Curated annotation (Swiss-Prot):
Keyword rRNA-binding: no
Species of provenance: Mycobacterium tuberculosis (strain CDC 1551 / Oshkosh)
Annotated family: Belongs to the autoinducer-2 exporter (AI-2E) (TC 2.A.86) family.
Family annotation (InterPro entries): AI-2E-like
Location relative to the cell: Cell membrane
Protein name per Swiss-Prot or TrEMBL: Putative transport protein MT1133
Length: 385
């Protein structure tokens, strides 16, 4: 093929290439999140894939890495959700036993008196809750909940084929990115008009942010969630440990933290008579749970992946708004791309020194391997050699 194009032909080819890339992005827009999740998984499990390739061929190494990734994610999450479901069933049974042994009419009268007493204390509020109004409200809530569950089950059954299709696509994309990562890296560097050095900078920043988000946000959130659930259990509330662990972990992933649950819960325990337990929950959250982030973040999050707290908060919520739950990862990655672009602009046009890459930490081998020709008493190689 003759590649000696004229200047006009080169410009036309560049425009056609840009149009093709934009059309490809538009064509695959419905699978953008799926591709990003597969790319994140492939990046995180690349060290394990390299370890397998030293012992097996490429195909077997990719299969072992895929199975390891599924086991590392599906098994713990499935076990935790299963335990939470068991605890929910036990709580439902305990509530049913309580209903059978409690005079609901007397309890309902006490609740109505309490609510009406609270309304009477509020100025300019003339509301009286009656048993009929409460009954109608409960019927309306039950109908709405039933309709929501019906729509949820209908959508879940209808999307089963879509879930299977997405899972198959994820496996293929994950394996393809895992095996062809170096080719893809070279291709991105060749297509980027800014050059391969800037491409390496972008990829390094993105990789650091992915590792920082997964290792930092998720691991720290899991530690904070378990710590918060443990404090509630120790304080005397022995129902729903795993439920609290899941809820507090999910809240800790979002920068608001699990304090929006544990602090009101501790205050409620104080008002209901468990003063020592409530104070323990509050102090545990303020002294232990909040400091888990301060202790683990410098260890788990790379320095070049740390954003300003305001930018991190905005990127997480903007990502959740645009991409759903996966926006917790995608949002900070997009924000680090914006920040890196500004840094490159300042370095090129304003002469601001660009931040250099961090040297990777030295990995110490506690049991170093010796080759067959290596001896403990062998002299070191000379400079002349």
């Amino acid at each position: 093929m003759n590649t000696e194009f004229t200047l006009t032909q080169k410009r036309a080819l560049a425009i056609l290439t840009l149009i093709a890339l934009l059309f490809g992005a538009y064509f695959l827009r419905n699978y953008f999140v799926l591709i990003v999740v597969a790319a994140v998984g492939a990046y995180l499990f690349t060290p394990l894939f390299k370890w397998f390739t030293k012992r097996f061929n490429t195909g077997l190494s990719a299969a072992c890495t895929l199975l390891s990734a599924l086991a590392a994610v599906v098994v713990p999450v499935g076990a935790l959700v299963g335990l939470a479901i068991v605890q929910i069933a036990r709580m439902v049974d305990s509530v049913a036993d309580w209903v059978r042994t409690t005079d609901l009419s007397t309890l309902g009268d006490k609740i109505l008196q309490f609510v009406n007493g609270l309304f009477d204390r509020v100025p300019f509020l003339h509301i009286t809750v009656t048993a009929d109004a409460l009954r109608k409200a409960m019927i309306s809530v039950a109908q709405n909940v039933g309709e929501w569950l019906l729509h949820f089950l209908r959508d879940a059954a209808g999307s089963l084929a879509g879930v299977i299709t997405s899972a198959i696509i994820f496996v293929y994309v994950f394996v393809a990115l895992l095996v062809n990562r170096e080719k893809l890296r070279t291709l991105i560097g060749q297509l980027n008009p800014l050059g391969e050095d800037v491409t390496d900078l972008y990829l390094q920043k993105m990789g650091s942010m992915v590792r920082g988000t997964v290792n930092g946000q998720f691991v720290i959130a899991a530690c904070q969630g378990v710590a918060g659930a443990a404090s509630i259990y120790i304080a005397g509330f022995h129902h729903g440990f795993f439920i609290f662990a899941i809820v507090l972990t999910a809240l800790s992933i979002i920068p608001l933290g699990g304090g929006i649950v544990t602090i009101p819960f501790g205050i409620g325990m104080i008002f209901y008579g468990n003063i020592a337990g409530g104070i323990f929950v509050l102090l545990w959250h303020l002294l232990v749970v909040t400091n888990i982030d301060n202790v683990l973040r410098p260890i788990l999050v790379p320095r070049d992946a740390r954003l300003n707290s305001a930018l991190m908060l905005l990127s997480v919520f903007a990502g959740i708004t645009m991409f759903g739950p996966w926006g917790i990862i995608i949002g900070p990655v997009l924000m680090i791309l914006i920040v890196t672009t500004i840094d490159v602009y300042l370095a090129v046009y304003k002469g601001v020194e660009l931040e250099q890459f961090e040297a990777p930490p030295v990995r110490r081998r506690w049991l170093p391997r010796r080759g067959p020709a290596t001896s403990r008493n062998a002299p070191p190689p000379s400079t002349a050699e």
